[in-house]
Every structure is written in structure tokens, then in C-alpha cells.
Amino acid sequence: MEPQLLGLLCTRNPAGADAIGKFILIGDHKQLPAVVLQSSEQSEVCDEALQAIGLYNLKDSLFERLYRNLSRESANRQTSTSHPSSLIPHPSYDMLCRQGRMNIEVALFPNRAFYGGLLEPVGLPHQQGELTLAPELCDCEFAGLLTRRVAFLPSAVEPPAQSAKMNHSEARIVARLAAAIYRQYAAVSGFNPAVTLGVITPYRSQIALIKKEIAALGIAPLEDILVDTVERFQGSERDVIIYSFCVNRAYQLKFLANMTEENGTRIDRKLNVALTRARRQMFMTGVPQLLKLNPIYAELLSVVCHS
């Protein structure tokens, strides 16, 4: 990737001087990187000269490498001097802390777990205030959840004889919940399949199963909502997100995660993307006893179930 940027980074004007005076890179290295087919072992960099400039793995982006180098320089400055100015971050990077997507409660866990509590809401209308239940849904099985910002619905594990990449219990929960969300938003503010609701799940088999359950409802607008993987959802948003974890075996937890570490904090980039797609409400369904085997998921369930 980096050699392809050379033409842009080294652009000269007719006088032979730099044609571009400053480059500003904006991104989030705590979310999913580009998809690389090679394993980390296959793309590992062993050349000492490349390691000296901070290039340890060919999977790392230029953005991430520059950020890592500047973070290291900043840490070295702070440990090499006791002058108060050493507490000032490196002048070449900073963090954008204000976010206008998520409601405060939706942002609570990812903000605390992945961003050190530094994210602040812009203060848009959807980021605050209470939700009101549509009167016709008072007898709905999800009446107690439809006005919550974040909720977890436990599912049953798939029998051993079935594929681990499908969970019928979760598919049925997702479909029934989607129907309730459709009725709620259609009555209160209007339902737009491309804006209101999206479903995230890790496997194509589960995607197909969820779509089948939704189609059986006979609610035409729901058949147009996006049901896809977290990788395909990155960069997009919906008012409401339903996340079907589809973990039926403990070994699947490794596939479900995309781990990195910063300042001693373990960050699951895949979970971070999934939890930050929702503007107004975030619903999750999964097998709790399996999810709790992962410390980050255990903390997530603890926060959600006690909020």
C-alpha cells in the first residue's frame, strides 16, 4: 500500500518544490483495518531496516504506523524530561473526541472500553432524551425493551448436530424483534429500511437464516433492511442495530474478535465497529454462558444487563 502513495506524497510543482504543503490523515485505528488474506505470520516483517521505521507487519496501514511512531515519540519525550511541556501530546497528532452518531447510552460501553472515556456527544437531539412506546405496542412481548437504548436478549445454543455457523434461536429472536421495531418506528417517526434498522451477524449461513425468518413475517419493508457482516457494515449507520453473535462453540470466540492493544488496553476492533453503528438503539442476542468466556464480552454483558 505505501509504495502506491509515493506519487501523492512526493508530488512536486513545476519549480521542483513540494506541491502539497501538508497532509492530514483522519481515521480510527481502533476499528477494523483493511481485509488482508495473509495471516499475521505470513505478513510479518523481519527486515531490521523496515522495523527501524516502525514497519513490523505488512498488514499495518500507513496511518496506523505513523500513529504508533508518533505515540512512541510522545512517550519518549515525557519520560526524558520533567518539564511541564512534556505532558503535551505530540504536535503531529491529536484525537477528535466529539461524536454525533451515537446516543449517550449507546456510546457508553465502547467509549469506556475502547476510547478511555474521551468521547463526548455533540448534543444532537437523538443523542439525548427518552424514547416513548407506541400505544399499540403496550402488549408486545418486547414492550419493555423498545424504549431501552441498549439491551441483550439471551438465546439458546444450537444443538451439536447442527452447524455452528447458524443459530435458529437467535434468528427467530431477531425476526420477532425486527417486527416490533418496525411497528414502533412506523407509528412514532416513520420506518425507512435504509435508515432505521440493520442486522449484523458474522456468518453467511446466519445471514440467510435471519432473512428467511424475516421473510416469513410478511412485512415487506423489513425484507429491504441490510442483514450483513460487521465488515460490510463498517462506515455505515442505522437508527437501530441488532447484533446476532451466533456463537455456539467456544472456539468461535476467536473468529468473532479482531484484537489489538494500546497502552495496555485490549481492544476488540470488530466488536467496536458493531457497537458503534447504531444511532438510537443497540440490541444484541447471543448465548451468554459462551460469550462470557471472553473477558471483553463478559464486561459488555455486565454493563448492559445492569444498566
Where are these regions (language model features)?
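Conserved helicase motor core of SF1/SF2 NTP-dependent helicases
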Residues: M1-S307
